[in-house]
Swiss-Prot record:
<dbReference type="GO" id="GO:0005524">
    <property type="term" value="F:ATP binding"/>
</dbReference>
<dbReference type="Pfam" id="PF07724">
    <property type="entry name" value="AAA_2"/>
</dbReference>
<keyword id="KW-0547">Nucleotide-binding</keyword>
<dbReference type="InterPro" id="IPR003959">
    <property type="entry name" value="ATPase_AAA_core"/>
</dbReference>
<dbReference type="InterPro" id="IPR003593">
    <property type="entry name" value="AAA+_ATPase"/>
</dbReference>
<protein>
    <recommendedName>
        <fullName>ATP-dependent Clp protease ATP-binding subunit ClpX</fullName>
    </recommendedName>
</protein>
<dbReference type="InterPro" id="IPR019489">
    <property type="entry name" value="Clp_ATPase_C"/>
</dbReference>
<dbReference type="GO" id="GO:0008270">
    <property type="term" value="F:zinc ion binding"/>
</dbReference>
<comment type="similarity">
    <text>Belongs to the ClpX chaperone family.</text>
</comment>
<dbReference type="InterPro" id="IPR004487">
    <property type="entry name" value="Clp_protease_ATP-bd_su_ClpX"/>
</dbReference>
<feature type="binding site">
    <location>
        <position position="40"/>
    </location>
    <ligand>
        <name>Zn(2+)</name>
    </ligand>
</feature>
<dbReference type="InterPro" id="IPR050052">
    <property type="entry name" value="ATP-dep_Clp_protease_ClpX"/>
</dbReference>
<dbReference type="GO" id="GO:0051603">
    <property type="term" value="P:proteolysis involved in protein catabolic process"/>
</dbReference>
<dbReference type="GO" id="GO:0016887">
    <property type="term" value="F:ATP hydrolysis activity"/>
</dbReference>
<feature type="binding site">
    <location>
        <position position="15"/>
    </location>
    <ligand>
        <name>Zn(2+)</name>
    </ligand>
</feature>
<keyword id="KW-0862">Zinc</keyword>
<dbReference type="GO" id="GO:0046983">
    <property type="term" value="F:protein dimerization activity"/>
</dbReference>
């Protein structure tokens, strides 16, 4: 019992937990057949606070362990993307900070962390799209690629910018929560630049108009998307997707941007400190890293959009050595893919170093970068892949420089027989 008889007729009350009487404590709170004093309440609150702090620390540690560090992100990118070291470092830090920020959301704090979307600038075939794809695969988040050239303002013929979010939803089976933490890669962003750096008087539905529409999406808005796809109509219930926490990566070749940068640097470089290098001597890969917001405005992007893409990474033009590495080194290297295809026929594929060099040189001449490597190799192997299922006893196919240049067909090596040229009887 929490009450005891004293010497007088007065009934003394005691704390059911520590046993102190009502005279020894400041306050005694009554419950059904029990009492608790203010000291025991303070002690309970202290225990709860300590346990809550410990669980918060454990949760934060678990959240950090789930998220790869910038070094781990960079290492994963290295497995698929050759070169572009500075761009990979910039992307690794930006993506790490973005998802760290998402884990911080919901906590009461004076400092509000804003989103840092990314702009990738680099020539065709330098790895912009592959970098974005690899990041999404590593982080296991929904990912979509959109082509800026197909977009128009709402109400005009073409794709509405909100179609991008619809595709993102489709890629995660219409799970809105997942979509709101996804990555959107908008390619060819340079192709929707306005025609001059002055605000347009006439309507530009596929240039400045699209930039304005994208601006709302990128900075964060509630996008209305028809459920399970389909066209919008007035009497329809829409899915509401908040784009505030979606990471937007915009990419483009920005052909001619180097001229804008050189014009600016030539003006600021007059005098004894001016660089002596001529415009012809300055490589595009040297110039693009000097990109400033004013250059992008001059090129035709609106200032508001540039402001929403604070992280800028430039990718260098791939040289012959880098293209040769791309052919053989990444996890999904092109040579490995074709070796796997021929291995399914029980045939070994050997591509000699001279052939790799010839493929790289051909891609450079075509100005297609890494993107053009597959078509060159496919063209060289086309006849072999067509005839191989009908051949018997072929052990190895050899591709050399002459095959790539179109001077000779691939060499077929038969079991315990002399080499034979493909297509000969």
């Amino acid at each position: 019992m929490a009450d005891k008889k004293g010497s007088s007729s007065e009934k003394l009350l005691y704390c059911s937990f520590c046993g102190k009487s009502q005279h020894e404590v400041k306050k005694l709170i009554a419950g059904p057949s029990v009492f608790i004093c203010d000291e025991c309440i303070d002690l309970c609150n202290e225990i709860i606070r300590d346990e809550a702090t410990a669980s918060e620390k454990d949760a934060a540690a678990a959240a950090r362990s789930d998220l790869p560090t910038p070094h781990e992100i960079r290492e994963s990118l290295d497995q698929y993307v050759i070169g572009q070291e500075q761009a990979k470092k910039i992307l690794a830090v930006a993506v790490y900070n973005h998802y760290k920020r998402l884990k911080h959301l919901g906590k009461k704090d004076d400092v509000e962390l804003s989103k840092s979307n990314i702009l990738l600038i680099g020539p065709t075939g330098s790895g912009k799209t592959l970098l974005a794809q690899t990041l999404a695969r590593l982080l296991n988040v929904p990912f979509v690629i959109a082509d800026a050239t197909t977009l128009t303002e709402a109400g005009y013929v073409g794709e509405d910018v909100e179609n991008i979010i619809q595709k993102l939803l489709q890629n995660c089976n219409y799970e809105v929560e997942k979509a709101q933490r996804g990555i959107v890669y908008i390619d060819e962003i340079d192709k929707i630049s306005r025609k001059s750096d002055n605000p347009s008087i006439t309507r530009d539905v596929s240039g400045e108009g699209v930039q304005q529409a994208l601006l709302k999406l990128i900075e964060g808005t509630m996008a209305s998307v028809p459920p399970q796809g389909g066209r919008k109509h007035p009497n329809q219930d829409f899915l509401q997707v908040d784009t505030t926490n979606i990471l937007f990566i915009c990419g483009g070749a920005f052909d001619g941007l180097e001229k804008v940068i050189m014009q600016r640097s030539d003006k600021t470089g007059i005098g004894f400190a001016a660089q002596v290098k001529s415009k012809e001597e300055r490589d595009v890969s040297e110039v693009l890293p000097q990109t400033e917001p004013e250059d992008l405005i001059k090129f035709g992007l609106i200032p508001e959009l540039i402001g929403r893409l604070p992280v800028v990474a430039t990718l260098a033009k791939l040289d012959e050595a880098a293209l040769m590495q791309i052919l053989v080194e990444p996890k999904n290297a092109l040579v490995k893919q074709y070796q796997k295809l021929l291995a399914m026929e029980g045939v070994e594929l050997e591509i000699r170093p001279g052939a790799l060099s010839a493929i790289a040189r051909k891609a450079i001449r075509r100005k297609t970068g890494a993107r053009g490597l597959r078509s060159i190799l496919e063209q060289s192997l086309m006849d072999v892949m067509y005839d191989l299922p009908n051949y018997k006893g072929v052990q190895k196919v050899v591709i050399d420089e002459n095959t790539i240049n179109g001077d000779a067909p691939p060499l077929l090596m038969y079991e315990e027989q002399q080499p034979k040229v493909a297509g000969s009887n």
